Amino acid sequence: QGKPSFCTKPITCKDEIAPPQLELDIREKLTVRVGEAFSLTGRYSGKPKPKITWYKDDITVKEDKRTMIQTTPATICLGVLKSVREDSGKYSVVVENSSGSRKGFCQVTVVDRPTPPVGPVIFDEVHKDHFVISWKPPLDDGGSPVTNYIIEKKDAHRDLWMPVTSASVKTTCKVPKLLEGRDYVVRI
């Protein structure tokens, strides 16, 4: 048996270090309807184990009855149930450890039907066989631009609504095919 050998320098034991990595399974923009659920998911890694923080519009997201955060050793998920318009915003996730940080984001838009146009309807021109109306757009477009207005008319003494147009993008419309002396009701 020989004599033991000694190291020439002291050795320091330390954990393996790897900067965080982040791969999101989402696009940069996500549109959902009011009442629908949505989730933002991805995978991450790093040593030491990274800290995960979710944000909405730069404010830390907290779990509640509709918002859930799940983190496993390799995956992340932020889920929102029964979305409301106020859930719209820029969501981001930060994965960080002592070696650095990574950030991913997604712009979420929660859309709904627009509110009705602002009244009253203005009768710009009135003729014996037609009139021209105008109105103001809705105060709330539902989260996306109004693509068309549906205008209908009816004789004031009947229950049957007749379409005037369903393709108007303007806030003005000519209502044709009227009978002189009759009263009409219009809805937009």
Task: Report each predicted region and the residues it spans.
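Beta-strand-rich modules
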Residues: Q1, K174-I188
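Flexible inter-domain hinge/linker segments at boundaries of tandem extracellular adhesion modules
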Residues: G2-R27, K56-E63, Q70-T75, E96-S99, ...
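Surface-exposed loops/turns
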Residues: V34, G46, T72, R85, ...
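A short beta-strand segment in extracellular, disulfide-stabilized domains
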Residues: E36-Y44, P120, F131-K136
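Extracellular Ig-like/FN3 beta-sandwich strand-entry sites
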Residues: A37, K47-K49, E86-K90, S101, ...
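Exposed aromatic-hydrophobic patches
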Residues: T41, C77-L81, K136, T172-K177
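Solvent-exposed loop segments of extracellular immunoglobulin-like
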Residues: P48-Y55, F131, P145-Y149
